[in-house]
A protein has these predicted regions:
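Local beta-strand N-terminus motif with an aromatic residue
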Residues: 75-77, 168, 278
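Conserved S-adenosyl-L-methionine
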Residues: 3, 263-327
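Glycine-rich helix-loop-beta junction characteristic of Rossmann-like nucleotide cofactor-binding loops
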Residues: 69-72, 135-136, 270-276
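Conserved Class I S-adenosyl-L-methionine
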Residues: 153-174
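Flexible, glycine-/basic-rich loop-and-beta segments that form/coincide
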Residues: 176-248, 252
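Short glycine-dipeptide loop
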Residues: 132, 137-143, 277-278, 298
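DnaQ-like (DEDDh/DEDDy) 3′-5′ exonuclease domain used for proofreading
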Residues: 1-132, 140, 144, 150, ...
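Conserved SAM-binding loop and adjacent beta-strand
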Residues: 252-266
């Protein structure tokens, strides 16, 4: 059946399921919540803290429901999600085993990005989650949904319906150099990030970026502050909606070996723009855990969720090495 005819059914079915979840009596499911201590913390510290960051293992739909029932409705100032891209691919993890003087690399399935009902199944999955995530957003909250060319145009239609077209703020283009080339179409070198607020009274702290002068020479205009680096002279201007940020390369310092790891600079821009110190930030497709790392760096609280074994192992290792707060 044509997708255009399926969209109303997806919306109707998703809304009915979401409202059923919101209205039913809550039965606390068995969910694994991890509390792991960094080398600098002890369990007694946890007992005296007012807030403990939370990392959940399991289906994010179940955990979103749990958070709503536990009083987190309208508590999140920022939600960032990086859901699957409908690539119809399976992603692998790798373990290096050292024995004597040899190394052996073992591969295993990290997660699947395949859907039993194809595109329809994907949109059904994302709709109900977006509907319930809106309930978690505070009145000053913003949601960033990280997608690419495969799904962004369809998900925007769903988000217009859920959040209202009037609350659409931006489609941020994350442009990068990495990736393949083609002789059959233009090389695909960007992702799309849809940004919606819950109300008109949302947090927005404008960030600055470098804007290089023509010819890289100083303008020496009155009242304009100029700076110089190895490239040339520049001024600082408010951030635009095209972000030139390199992917996490194979030799990058921050690389943790997770295929779809997002760069810290990307999350830094999002978190500093759309949250304040003390804000609660959520990531319900946590992946490599970059959201939590950057949230903590800038004194934000976080809750992250993922069901992948590789994701949870990666996040635990990363946060422990980062000497993170208890979670």
């Amino acid at each position: 059946m044509d997708l255009i005819w399926e969209l109303p059914r997806i919306v109707k079915k998703g809304r009915e399921r979401a409202e059923k979840i919101l209205n039913k009596d809550y039965e606390d499911p068995i969910i694994q919540q991890m509390i792991i201590l960094s080398d600098t913390r002890n369990r007694q510290d946890i007992l005296t803290e007012e807030w403990i960051n939370q990392l959940y293992s399991g289906d994010n739909l179940i955990i979103i429901e749990k958070l709503l029932k536990l009083g987190y409705r309208e508590k999140f100032d920022l939600i960032y999600i990086d859901p699957p891209f409908l690539t119809n691919a399976n992603y692998k993890g790798r373990i290096v085993i050292k024995t004597n003087n040899t190394k052996e690399t073992l591969e295993y399935l990290a997660y699947r990005d395949t859907w039993e009902k194809g595109f329809i199944g994907y949109l059904e999955m994302i709709y109900i989650r977006l509907f319930l995530l809106k309930e978690l957003l505070s009145p000053k909250g913003t949601i960033y949904v990280h997608l690419d060319y495969r799904t962004v145009h369809y998900v925007k239609i769903l988000m217009d319906e859920i959040f209202g077209r009037e609350n659409f703020l931006n489609e941020v283009i994350w442009a990068y150099k990495s990736g393949g080339t083609s002789n059959r179409y233009f090389s695909r070198k960007h992702d799309n990030i849809l940004v919606y607020s819950k109300t008109k009274d949302y947090i927005f702290n404008p960030q600055l970026e470098k804007s290089y002068n023509r010819g890289l020479k100083p303008y020496r205009l009155k009242g304009v502050e100029e700076f110089q680096d190895d490239i040339g002279w520049y001024t600082l201007v408010k951030l635009k909606d095209v972000w030139q940020i390199d992917m996490v390369g194979r030799t990058s310092r921050e690389r943790v070996g997770y295929d779809t790891q997002k760069p810290e600079k990307l999350l830094e821009r999002i978190i500093l723009t759309s949250s304040d110190e003390g804000s609660l930030i959520g990531d319900f497709f946590a992946g490599s855990g970059t959201t939590g790392v950057i949230a903590e760096k800038y004194d934000r609280k976080w809750i992250m969720v993922d069901k992948g074994g590789l994701s949870l192992t990666t996040i635990n290792k990363r946060l422990i090495e980062n000497q993170s707060q208890s979670y």
